[in-house]
């Protein structure tokens, strides 16, 4: 038996073990790459995830959700939200576009200089494109009202870039 689907094995050990135990052949769509290393089956899901991350984050900034009562775009006399996006791939770029469209102040961090150059060319003026390191993450985290994790390591679990204690600072 062969199963073709989005498995996300790296995030679900139980599922991984169950599939191994079943003896079925598993083809994880999210790991299928083309000749250039792109992930064409993951791209559409990533576009949606990036766009939805801003919508979902905005909800949790609202007071009824125990948020701080921050409106993404602000209002006259009140500054817009500061949004930190960790990762400048498909998810991060789509999140940045949506957040920028709401007139939020956006910082998108990545470690790939080619990707940063591309993002700097295509993003609107309210998006800062920065090289990611511990110092920059800590600095931007202090300013952020909303943080969106968008780092992808194909076939692996995303790295933990923020420690819980940093969220309390």
Which residues are covered by each model-predicted region?
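Rossmann-fold NAD(P) dinucleotide-binding segment
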Residues: 1-10, 138-146, 156-169
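Glycine/serine-rich phosphate-binding loop and adjoining beta1-alpha1 elements at the start
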Residues: 2-82
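Hydrophobic alpha-helical scaffolding
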Residues: 5, 43, 47, 106-109, ...
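Short, acidic/turn-prone active-site loops that include or flank metal/cofactor-
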Residues: 8-11, 31-33, 112-113, 133-135, ...
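Generic hydrophobic/aromatic pocket-lining and core-packing "Φ" positions
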Residues: 16, 54, 95-96, 116, ...
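Short amphipathic alpha-helical segments
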Residues: 16-17, 96-98, 120-121, 159-163
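Glycine-rich phosphate/diphosphate-binding loop of Rossmann-like nucleotide-binding domains
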Residues: 64-149
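Active-site glycine- and acidic-residue-rich loops that bind
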Residues: 127-129, 152-161
């Amino acid at each position: 038996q062969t199963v073709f689907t989005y498995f996300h094995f790296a995030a679900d050990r139980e599922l991984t073990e169950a599939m191994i135990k079943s003896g079925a052949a598993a083809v994880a769509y999210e790991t299928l790459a083309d000749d250039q290393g792109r992930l064409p089956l993951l791209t559409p899901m990533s576009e949606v995830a990036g766009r939805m991350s801003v919508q979902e984050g905005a909800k949790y900034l609202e007071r009824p959700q125990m948020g701080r009562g921050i409106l993404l775009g602000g209002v006259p006399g009140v500054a817009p939200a500061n949004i930190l996006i960790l990762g400048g791939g498909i998810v991060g770029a789509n999140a940045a576009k949506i957040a920028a469209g709401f007139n939020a102040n956006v910082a998108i961090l990545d470690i790939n200089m080619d990707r940063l150059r591309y993002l700097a060319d295509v993003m609107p003026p309210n998006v800062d494109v920065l090289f990611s390191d511990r110092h920059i993450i800590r600095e931007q985290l202090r300013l952020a009202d909303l943080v969106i994790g968008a780092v992808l390591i194909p076939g692996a679990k995303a790295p933990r870039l923020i420690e819980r204690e940093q969220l309390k600072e």
